[in-house]
Amino acid sequence: MSKRKILMPVRTVAEWGGVHEWTVDAASALVKPGQEVTFVGSGGGVQERAEATGASFKVVNWKKGWKKVAQQVGEEGNFDLIFSHAPAARQFGLVANEIAQKEHVVMIHGAYHDFMYEWSDQVDAFVAASPSLVHFVQRFGRVAPWKVSNLPNAAPDEVFELPLLSHDEKLKDGVGHIVTASRLSKDKTPQIDSVEEAVRALSELYPDIKWQIDVCGDGPLRDYFDRRYRMLSRELKNVSHVMHGWVLPQDVPQMMNNAFLTVTAGMAGMRALASGSLCLGTGARATVGIQTGKNLRAGIWSNFGDHGVFRFTPTSVSGDLKELASSSAYDRAVSVARAVIKQSNSQNIVNGMMLSALQCE
């Protein structure tokens, strides 16, 4: 089989986020063995990162004129596979492929049905970012089950090489860090409640520790997040918060590595566990608790609550934190979670799954 020429339309509403990170990592993995990748997107930061992998980039205005560009791309036909990401991007792919008649694989990153039942017969396969989304696409999108496979989020291999810091090391200076990492928008507001629940429990369990909430990310509700955390800091005297804004992707795992607890979901959840942080999974559709035991199973299944989970009730956050207040229990929980993720969601493993799903050499 010859190397493939892959057209990758990508469209998201945020300047940077999990979908961007996923597709840039994917491009890197595809280019390395010799596949040709051409992004279609709005430019900006994602273009810079995509081109750094060796991929080409075609800039498109998603608000106007994209359909004409898609038709032109289809007429040129300089690809043998379309790998689309997010609804507007799959529309681009469908328009281009109506002319080109090549293979088309659609990646599903979130729980939106996108009227899949109206167009699923026009694409060759679906890959979904969690087992929860596989179920969603088959059941609610009404896509033929054989067409759908799981291609999960991953953590970079190098993140697993960060040293595992113990419970005592993370608190040795009298300061404990609680990291959140996400776009600051409406669908992420449940994380505030989870942070509040956790920090209340930690303040009581460790009254002599000063707890700092490190908020990584930005977005339309930045002021709301800031206000809520400021109110919490005023109420609990040993709690403060810092709004870091967007942090470089490679620096986020280091912050998580030093954190006693990370409250997040999605790709950031994978990075939290890989980095050696205790993680409280809170996503757009569910809270799946402190990531140990059955909570960890539900977290991996649902992308840490971002994609929804059915017939599941997490264990008590305060109860779990109390049980993990001993150094040995905390250290074991962190070590087990990292090992589980390394065996199923390290970047190298997921890269192989992607090459297989796209039928690349």
What is the predicted role of each segment?
Residues 18, 165-166, 310-359:
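A charged, aromatic-enriched C-terminal amphipathic alpha-helix characteristic of glycosyltransferases
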Residues 56, 225-247:
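Nucleotide-activated donor-binding/catalytic signature segment of Leloir-type glycosyltransferases, i.e.
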Residues 84-90, 108:
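Short His-centered aromatic/hydrophobic patch
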